[in-house]
């Protein structure tokens, strides 16, 4: 019996344990892509000026090729509210009048046969859920790929070390070149297939985690 109890406890601990890996600051998935350096051309006239390295005061500075940097303005705000309720009523009423036979009531042991039964049930349940989140800030990302239609696949991360922990923001998504503003910024609400992650690691982040025993009581494994 003790052997089965130890096995059951081990299974519960294994189920409650978290296998999620901690994020790393040098994740290769978010590594920047650098544009290839153009071949150096020697001017035939001996002049220092070269057309390949020239830029105009009126040129477009918006990101449009692999390796360019674009600033994403985070303007995320979500709010969800849900309420549900149900009420179930059920009742039954049954009666059996005394049975007459031969001009008198039929009785058992001198007690007339008479039955009265009444039952009722009323169940009412209500639930409310309200959740809201907001995220403001900015992060610069790298253009990882340019699609055939001109859309840009962008990806980037920002790590900030504060006291005993690190905070990070990771962004990946798809943007249209037309939605990029003249100052080379774009709102996060204009990103398609956006993945925005804001979290942290260290002492403060660990303090916000729920312990394994509390996770068990709040999980589907708890029978009550």
From Swiss-Prot:
It is found in: Cell outer membrane; Bacterial flagellum basal body. Its main location: membrane. Pfam families: FlgH. One of its GO terms (molecular function) is cytoskeletal motor activity. It is a lipid-anchor. Residues 1-15 form the signal peptide. Keywords: Bacterial flagellum, Cell outer membrane, Lipoprotein, Membrane, Palmitate, Signal. The basal body constitutes a major portion of the flagellar organelle and consists of four rings (L,P,S, and M) mounted on a central rod. Belongs to the FlgH family. HAMAP family: FlgH. This is Flagellar L-ring protein. The lineage of its organism: Bacteria, Pseudomonadati, Pseudomonadota, Gammaproteobacteria, Alteromonadales.
């Amino acid at each position: 019996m003790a052997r089965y109890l130890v096995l059951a406890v081990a299974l519960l601990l294994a189920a409650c344990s978290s296998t999620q890996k901690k994020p790393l600051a040098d994740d290769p998935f978010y590594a920047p892509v650098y544009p290839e350096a153009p071949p150096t051309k020697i001017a035939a006239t001996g002049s220092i000026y070269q057309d390949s390295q020239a830029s105009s005061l009126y040129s477009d500075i918006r990101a449009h090729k692999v390796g360019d940097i674009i600033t994403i303005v985070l303007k995320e705000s979500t709010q969800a509210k849900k309420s549900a309720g149900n009420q179930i009523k059920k009742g039954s009423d049954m009666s059996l009048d005394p049975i007459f036979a031969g001009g008198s009531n039929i009785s058992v042991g001198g007690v007339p046969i008479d039955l009265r039964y009444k039952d009722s049930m009323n169940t009412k349940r209500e639930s409310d859920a309200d959740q809201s989140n907001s995220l403001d800030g900015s992060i610069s990302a790298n253009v990882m790929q340019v699609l055939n239609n001109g859309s840009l696949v962008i990806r980037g991360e920002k790590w900030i070390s504060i006291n005993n922990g690190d905070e990070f923001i990771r962004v990946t998504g798809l943007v249209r070149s037309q939605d990029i503003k003249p100052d080379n910024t774009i709102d996060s609400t204009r990103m398609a297939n956006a993945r925005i992650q804001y979290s942290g690691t260290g002492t403060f982040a660990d303090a916000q985690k729920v312990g394994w025993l509390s996770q068990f009581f709040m999980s589907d494994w708890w029978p009550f």
